[in-house]
Amino acid sequence: MIVGILTTLATLATLAASVPLEERQACSSVWGQCGGQNWSGPTCCASGSTCVYSNDYYSQCLPGAASSSSSTRAASTTSRVSPTTSRSSSATPPPGSTTTRVPPVGSGTATYSGNPFVGVTPWANAYYASEVSSLAIPSLTGAMATAAAAVAKVPSFMWLDTLDKTPLMEQTLADIRTANKNGGNYAGQFVVYDLPDRDCAALASNGEYSIADGGVAKYKNYIDTIRQIVVEYSDIRTLLVIEPDSLANLVTNLGTPKCANAQSAYLECINYAVTQLNLPNVAMYLDAGHAGWLGWPANQDPAAQLFANVYKNASSPRALRGLATNVANYNGWNITSPPSYTQGNAVYNEKLYIHAIGPLLANHGWSNAFFITDQGRSGKQPTGQQQWGDWCNVIGTGFGIRPSANTGDSLLDSFVWVKPGGECDGTSDSSAPRFDSHCALPDALQPAPQAGAWFQAYFVQLLTNANPSFL
């Protein structure tokens, strides 16, 4: 369901060469698909756009050429190759290495007490900023272009959704270290999102690892790689959201064979992640779905029991601060009038949700859990959703409350933007390998590119409907 930043968009290798004018008539339009595995459509782009690799399943026609100055920055931070250091980010550990010795922590740790969002400024995701500057702004003018530039400066999380994305984490932390040495006090924000058989109840964001093909061991190597980076940059506070959708699927979707098969692997992998990343400079939040998913009365206690068990089975790690809600979703924080699509559930916003599940966590042995809530796409209420469970590229949405630790709520550590607005949730093309029917519903904006690809029309929608406004 949830899509992170699955791939680089704007400035990786250009795939399409110049096409004669007579052939342009059959080329894809700007923002259309122009390549990818099993793609049988046009592999060229209309005049004024260039075919750019996005992922193995998708290449996209982007405006202009990939050699602009704004694209150069993106290229320097989105390489698909491993970093040229002694660290290995591709080797798979032997099957027997299911538990590894916890290596020592680096010196100069950015420790904290209490709310980890207090006393630091979350870092604005440079990759997302490069997308906005190179993909969104060139086709905007006037006030919209100025507003888009302001969006690029809002702190948002970077998604580590493949092993190949870990060099981006390293580069980001290096940039933060430089900024902090020059007088800043920044913290890094990342999403750990690479479970084997990921997204078990949907199709749009299937990941790179399979349980049947050594996925658990590969995932542990992915976590080891992240840990090495975090230890190397132990002078920087690092804020992590752990595996969106995974545990929530274990609450409600075990009737789906893929989820039932993945249950033990999910729990083993998440235990490994929160144990290995239990570092003095780290604060972690397990993804906890949202009010319209686990906030229903029948789901609240089973969810709380599962989250508390994960916490206790990992020996109550200090760095596991609590839960993240509404990641990549659309619910308002404290709206007072329930939208029609929430009918039947008294827990119709995220504030009600965290105050419902917080005491239940304590009942099950996790008494000091706190929360963050994603408001990146929650600015317009009600949304255009026809059903509360409609999650893909929903119409009638806008950028929401800006990230801030000034929440006015004892359980909420911070408002955050976890989902970078403008990156697609999933394709509306029913012939695509990762097509999910939710992305072709009447309340999904269409036509939509592959998950993770830039969706200009959606970015414009979010910007137009933003509350507070950027205009």
From Swiss-Prot:
Cysteines engaged in disulfide bonds, as pairs: C200-C259, C392-C439
CBM1 domain residues are 26-62
| GO-annotated molecular function | cellulose 1,4-beta-cellobiosidase activity; cellulose binding; identical protein binding
**EC number(s) per UniProt?**
3.2.1.91
What pH dependence of activity is documented? Answer: Optimum pH is 4-6.
- The positions annotated as site (Not glycosylated) read N38
Query: Under which main EC class is this enzyme filed?
Result: hydrolase
UniProt keyword Cytoplasm present: no
Residues annotated as the enzyme's active site:
D245
Which residue windows does the record flag with biased composition (Low complexity)? 64-101
Ranges for the region named Disordered are 64-108
What are the residue positions of the site described as Transition state stabilizer that also modulates the pKa of Asp-245 and may act as a proton acceptor through a water chain?
A: D199
Q: Where is this region: Linker?
A: 66-106
Name the catalysed reactions.
Hydrolysis of (1->4)-beta-D-glucosidic linkages in cellulose and cellotetraose, releasing cellobiose from the non-reducing ends of the chains
Question: What are the GO BP annotations of this UniProt entry?
Answer: cellulose catabolic process
Q: Where is this region: Catalytic?
A: 107-471
Processing after translation: Asn-334 contains mainly a high-mannose-type glycan (Hex(7-9)GlcNAc(2)) in a 3:1 ration with a single GlcNAc. Asn-313 was primarily unglycosylated with a small fraction (18%) bearing a single GlcNAc at this site.
Q: Name one GO cellular component term.
A: extracellular region
**Taking the first listed entry, what is the main subcellular location of this protein, grouped into a coarse class?**
secreted
Please share what else the UniProt entry notes about this protein: T.reesei produces two different exocellobiohydrolases. They are unique in that they can hydrolyze crystalline cellulose in the absence of endoglucanases.
Domains: what does the record tell us?
The enzyme consists of two functional domains, a catalytic core joined to a carbohydrate-binding domain (CBM) by a serine-, threonine-, and proline-rich, highly glycosylated linker sequence.
Family per similarity comment: Belongs to the glycosyl hydrolase 6 (cellulase B) family.
Quote the function comment for this protein: Exocellobiohydrolases (CBH) that catalyzes the hydrolysis of 1,4-beta-D-glucosidic bonds in cellulose to release the disaccharide cellobiose. The degradation of cellulose involves an interplay between different cellulolytic enzymes. Hydrolysis starts with endoglucanases (EGs), which cut internal beta-1,4-glucosidic bonds in cellulose to reduce the polymerization degree of the substrate and create new chain ends for exocellobiohydrolases (CBHs). The CBHs release the disaccharide cellobiose from the non-reducing end of the cellulose polymer chain.
Q: What is this protein called?
A: Exoglucanase 2
The organism's lineage is: Eukaryota, Fungi, Dikarya, Ascomycota, Pezizomycotina
Q: Which gene encodes it?
A: cbh2
